[in-house]
Amino acid sequence: MTTEKSLVAEAENSQHQQQKEEGEGVTNSGQQETQLEELSQEAAEGDNHCEQKLKTSNGDTPTHEDLTKNKERTSENRGLSRLFSSFLKRPKSQVSEEEGKDVESAKEKCEGGQKEIEFGTSLDEEIILKAPIAAPEPELKTDPSLDLHSLSSAETQPAQEEHREDPDFETKEGGGLEECSKIEVKEESPESKAERELKASQKSIRRHRNMHCKVSLLDDTVYECVVEKHAKGQDLLKRVCEHLNLLEEDYFGLAIWDNGASKTWLDSAKEIKKQVRGVPWNFTFNVKFYPPDPAQLTEDITRYYLCLQLRQDIVSGRLPCSFATLALLGSYTIQSELGDYDPELHGAEYVSDFKLAPNQTKELEEKVMELHKSYRSMTPAQADLEFLENAKKLSMYGVDLHKAKDLEGVDIILGVCSSGLLVYKDKLRINRFPWPKVLKISYKRSSFFIKIRPGEQEQYESTIGFKLPSYRAAKKLWKVCVEHHTFFRLTSTDTLPKSKFLALGSKFRYSGRTQAQTRQASALIDRPAPHFERTASKRASRSLDGAAAVDSDRSPRPTSAPAIAQSQDAEGTVPGAPVKKTVVSKAQKETVKDEEKKEEGPPDQAEPEPTEVWKDLDKSQEEIKKHHASISELKKNFMESVPEPRPSEWDKRLSTHSPFRTLNINGQLPTGEGPPLVKTQTVTISDTANSVKSEIPTKDVPIVHTETKTITYEAAQTDDSNGDLDPGVLLTAQTITSETTSSTTTTQITKTVKGGISETRIEKRIVITGDADIDHDQVLVQAIKEAKEQHPDMSVTKVVVHQETEISEE
């Protein structure tokens, strides 16, 4: 109301007074305008200052809305300055009063609570009378010390005193301090909780970091241990071998069985948890690489666990054997576990306590007992060695089988062994791919491929494919092939070069030691032979220190363990009787050896004489004959599924009228039972010797006069004598005979192994009978041509032409 009255009074004043005061009004107008602007800014800053204190006491932070409101407040300040321009012409008294009101309003805004709200309402009423002004909004928090520089000391001190005297402000500040202290306490409590949670998580990790493993060993015992969760396969294998006291651990591995039928080898270079499905970690300890020659193993304990693996293979049916082989291997098993036969200790059915065959019969047990009783002073290590020497000759020894199909969809079985890849159909081997002939092995999806090296007559490589049940089966077969090839064929393992770019293909490689490296490491073993206990009989081992050194006067093999499995003699006689024996050597020389030659030969190749071996046994002659009869039966049936060679008519004639036999005994014919001697004439032409043998006449007997000529064509051989002394180990023998009205053709295929090298030799005999004259040269050329056409990858080493003609009486 005072402002309106002052305006009316000013209108009633005279004009001359107004003109006098115009100069002063103009000069004072600038000062009043600046003072009003400062007051408006101070009021706004006071509001902001109070809001900032409240926000800082509550622990709030400036937001985006505060930033925008700060800009709006500056615009509002400019609007206030324009509105106050209408009051410039008023007298100083009125202006000073309004300035005091404005200062008081600015001071009252700093006070919180109800005073601020009441002042806001009164201020709004005055603003409505003057001009519409927007209500002030909170701004961004700023430092109050920086905002006070625009105010004088006289203006700031009363405000500070009022703040100090205001109890509400103190309580608010105190509440803010209390909240800050509470916040600090809350900040400490989350840290303690975090530490507690971290410790609890560490405890839980420590609890679940170790995994429990169960490993089924070869002696039907279970080894349990705890390994780290991130442990690799080689860590667990090393712990198992340490438990078993095995140093030659590279031949063994840990297997994971899927559905109890198919096994997967645990990769020693990868973590176990990435290879095992599920929490229970159950494995089996098995032989992974079957050594081709177990005698080269250094320690007896290694051979013992190899024997245990082979026993499991026989019982499960993975290693098929004939009846005679089962009896022989079973007798060595009993000897290894129980020792020599003792009628006081062993009962009548002590063999039935052992599982020796998948279908064990009473007849088999009796045969095993019979052979076991014949052994004397044979140590467990010797029995294990004899067991391995006979088991390694079996066709399925160390073969890892995988089911597959050929390209035509026929079910086959692929076998991986130390020598190569084998193909079986209906339990018969139909093909073989040795490692030297395999260039590359690969798999794609569920298909498995092998690339074969071209032969002599071929120009390009050939690729053979097989279909497997699944992708995992194809990958597993590929891994097994890679591991076997690396272990048996390479001297050291291959390491993949680190490529900077993305490499295609699998990075899997065999990470263990090869067989060559294992043998080098085994040669450095200098510990004494470990004493171990056989689980079946709880019998301690009497080691032979590797069974390498044996007395020369005593053969390490008993009479029932032949050094080399041979088929029965062509004549069908008992080995103990004096016979004339035909031996086909490795170089395919046909020689006839009688008793005198056999006695002069080395003891390794001659059969052990029964009188010398059984001299100290006090046995009767009937038992000796019975024992040797069993030996002959074992020899006869050892090579299972192999037809016995049928002697031809030419074999019988050669055994009695052979010129080589006559030359071997220096021209003297031995006397003995047999048909009457006939007159013979021999002409031998040899390309290697380039000499003609002299005519050897015999006694004249008035029966039949015949003339026999033998012409030998033989390729030059450097190690001919050594080949005769060491014929090698016979793997398979097959005889095929075809007859016509005038000729008989006999083909004999033999496979032998000497020094780790397998050789296949084919001997073809053609006997032509007839009264007409025969062009022998033409027959010879035709026979050689047919042999080369039938077997292009083989070479002819020897051709023998045997001609026998009757001579008319003079």
Swiss-Prot record:
Region feature (C-terminal (CTD)): 660-810
SMART domains (alphabetical): B41, FA, FERM_C
Residues covered by the FERM domain: 211-492
Cellular localisation: Nucleus; Cytoplasm, Cytoskeleton; Cytoplasm, Cell cortex
Keywords: Actin-binding, Calmodulin-binding, Cell cycle, Cell division, Cytoplasm, Cytoskeleton, Glycoprotein, Mitosis, Nucleus, Phosphoprotein, Transport
Positions carrying Phosphotyrosine: 223
Region (Spectrin--actin-binding): 615-659
Compositionally biased residues, Basic and acidic residues: 62-76, 102-118, 160-200, 587-601
Post-translational modification: O-glycosylated; contains N-acetylglucosamine side chains in the C-terminal domain.
Post-translational modification Phosphoserine, affected residues: 14, 85-86, 96, 105, 122, 150, 152-153, 189, 192, 522, 541, 543, 555, 620, 630, 655, 658
GO molecular function, one term: actin binding
Functional description taken from the UniProt entry: Protein 4.1 is a major structural element of the erythrocyte membrane skeleton. It plays a key role in regulating membrane physical properties of mechanical stability and deformability by stabilizing spectrin-actin interaction. Recruits DLG1 to membranes. Required for dynein-dynactin complex and NUMA1 recruitment at the mitotic cell cortex during anaphase.
Classification via PANTHER family: 4.1 G PROTEIN, PROTEIN 4.1
Name of the protein in question: Protein 4.1
Species this protein is from: Canis lupus familiaris
Upper lineage: Eukaryota, Metazoa, Chordata, Craniata, Vertebrata
